[in-house]
Amino acid sequence: MDLMMAQNSTYFTPGTEYRYSNSGYALLALVVERISGQSFAGFLHENIFLPLDMNGTVAHEEGISTIFNRAYGYTFSNGAYVPNDQSLTSAVLGDGGIYSSTTDMAAWDHALYKAQLVPYYVLNEAFISGTLTSGSETGYGFGWVLDTYLYRNRVSHTGSTTGFKNVYQRYPDAGLSIIVLTNRSSGSPKDIANGIAQTIL
């Protein structure tokens, strides 16, 4: 927060352009804490992870959280993969710091299709593109990239940090979701996910 408050300029006049930023999610986590009176990690655990039986998912808090069966990151160097793992404290909660599995991510995905956590009318707002003051759409909703692939609507997001690259794609009209989690810095999970979509769709 101190880093954000120290800024005295913006890249452009707000509303005139779109630029992805993790800072907004870090700020949102602070808003959740202020309104709920809980830590952000505690709020996620109580309101999302527990209700959905995401028992292997943790929003990491240094000195508090335990991460079982954790995968470690690697980078290809000098002809071999070598450990190159992020620090457990390198990700700020809100825009990162969550450890999960494909099984738990599937539970989260199912909850989105069934609107288990919030009503459909609230959930659907996340899948509406932002609009600039010019009237142009940004192609980004509330935490989702909105585009088309193979002539189908797609909502997705990528994520990466030292030693890890991941992608989560959803094709709501087809009821198809693809989650690719990797523990290496090289390669393209998005290409893998696109290939899976091509095979299925």
Predicted regions and their residues:
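A generic structural signal for nonpolar/aromatic side chains embedded in well-ordered alpha-helices
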Residues: L3-M5, Y74, A126
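Mobile, glycine-enriched helix-loop/loop "lid" segments at the mouths of ligand-binding/catalytic clefts
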Residues: S65-S77
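A generic membrane alpha-helix/interface feature
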Residues: N55, N69-A71, P119, T133
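A short, ordered amphipathic alpha-helix with a cationic face
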Residues: E17-R19, G79-V82
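Catalytic-site signature segments of enzymes, centered on catalytic residues
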Residues: M1-T66, S90-A106
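Catalytic loop of the DD-peptidase/beta-lactamase superfamily, centered on the K-T-G motif
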Residues: E33-Q38, G42-E46, L50, A80-L201
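Short alpha-helix boundary/capping motifs
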Residues: A59-E61, F76-S77, T133-S136
